């Protein structure tokens, strides 16, 4: 029983390390993925497409996702390229 509990703890720790990224989904243009005119479930669906566990439309402007893999590109103010072309 002790080994099983230890196994579960290790499993959850690995899951937290592997998929711990959260942030705004970014489109191909470098901008946040807009959700202003989308249905309520749009962001949750978009987040699950990139293997995130959940997401919502933050202030009705942009999709924010939780627990995404590290390979997913997210919008960051420091590296913002939105509106500057490719």
UniProtKB/Swiss-Prot annotation:
Q: Which InterPro entries match?
A: LCN-type_CS_alpha_beta_dom (IPR044062), Scorpion_toxin-like (IPR003614), Scorpion_toxin-like_sf (IPR036574), Scorpion_toxinL (IPR018218), Scorpion_toxinL/defensin (IPR002061)
Arginine amide: which positions carry it? 84
Q: Where in the cell is it found?
A: Secreted
Q: Which Pfam families match?
A: Toxin_3
One of the GO biological process terms: defense response
Q: What does the record list as coiled-coil region(s)?
A: none
**What family does the database annotate?**
Belongs to the long (4 C-C) scorpion toxin superfamily. Sodium channel inhibitor family. Beta subfamily.
UniProt function note: Beta toxins bind voltage-independently at site-4 of sodium channels (Nav) and shift the voltage of activation toward more negative potentials thereby affecting sodium channel activation and promoting spontaneous and repetitive firing.
Give the domain note: Has the structural arrangement of an alpha-helix connected to antiparallel beta-sheets by disulfide bonds (CS-alpha/beta).
Quote the protein name from its UniProt record: Toxin Td2
Q: What species is given as this protein's source?
A: Tityus discrepans (Venezuelan scorpion)
